[in-house]
A protein has these predicted regions:
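The feature marks proteins involved in alpha-glucan
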Residues: 1-41, 74-156
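Terminal peptide-recognition signature
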Residues: 48, 157
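Structural beta-strand segments of beta-rich domains
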Residues: 42-46
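Solvent-exposed serine/threonine-rich low-complexity stretches and specific carbohydrate-binding patches
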Residues: 67-75
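Short loop/turn segments at connectors of secondary-structure elements within structured domains
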Residues: 52, 66, 89-91
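Short beta-strand elements bearing conserved aromatic residues within extracellular beta-rich modules
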Residues: 56-58, 93
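Short proline/glycine-enriched turn/loop motifs at strand-loop junctions of beta-rich domains
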Residues: 49-56
C-alpha cells in the first residue's frame, strides 16, 4: 500500500533542523526515493541535498536518461525535491546535477535503499517498509561488545 505524500517540510521543521545540525539519525526517512501517492497518482518522491547545485534533475530508464526532463525544485537550503508519477519499485535512477561551472554530473542517490550490481552504479527505487530484518543475533552480540576497546573498521567511500 502506498503512503500518502506529506507536505514539503518548512526549513524550521524538526527533521530539517536536525539534518542541518548533523543530528538527524533518521534522515533516510526523508531523503532518497520514496514510493508514495500524490493527488491519487502513484509514483516516487525524490529528495536530495545538493547545496551548491545550480539545478538537479532525475534521470533514468523512465525518461531515457534525459537531463532536465524531470527537474527538481529547491525547497529549502539546498534540499531539492520532485514527485515523478509512474515510477515503480526497482526502477533505476540517478541525480543529474548542474554544477556552478555548468557541468553535468551524474550521481547515485546517497540515501538509496537498493543499487545496481557493479560495474553499474545506478540507484534503484525500493520500499523498505515491511522488510524483514534478519540481524537479531548480530545485534544481540553487538550489544555485548566493548566498543571502546574493540578494533574498528574504517571505509573510504568515493
Amino acid at each position: 500500500m502506498l503512503k500518502q505524500r506529506k507536505e514539503t517540510p518548512k526549513s524550521s521543521d524538526l527533521p530539517i533542523y536536525l539534518f542541518k545540525q548533523g543530528n538527524n539519525q533518521e534522515a533516510y526517512r526523508y531523503f532518497g526515493a520514496h514510493l508514495c501517492e500524490q493527488n491519487g497518482e502513484a509514483g516516487v518522491v525524490f529528495r536530495v541535498w545538493a547545496p551548491h547545485a545550480k539545478a538537479v534533475s532525475i534521470v533514468g530508464d523512465f525518461n531515457s536518461w534525459t537531463p532536465g526532463e524531470h527537474p527538481m525544485e529547491m525547497v529549502t537550503d539546498g534540499i531539492w525535491e520532485r514527485f515523478v508519477p509512474g515510477i515503480k519499485q526497482f526502477d533505476v535512477y540517478k541525480y543529474c546535477i548542474t554544477t556552478p561551472a555548468d557541468e553535468l554530473v551524474y550521481k547515485a542517490d546517497p540515501y538509496a535503499f537498493h543499487t545496481e550490481t557493479r560495474p553499474s552504479n545506478g540507484s534503484k527505487v525500493y520500499d523498505i517498509e515491511g522488510y524483514e530484518w534478519g540481524d537479531a543475533a548480530w545485534i544481540k552480540d553487538e550489544q555485548k561488545r566493548d566498543v571502546i576497546n574493540s578494533p574498528m573498521s574504517i571505509y573510504e567511500l568515493q
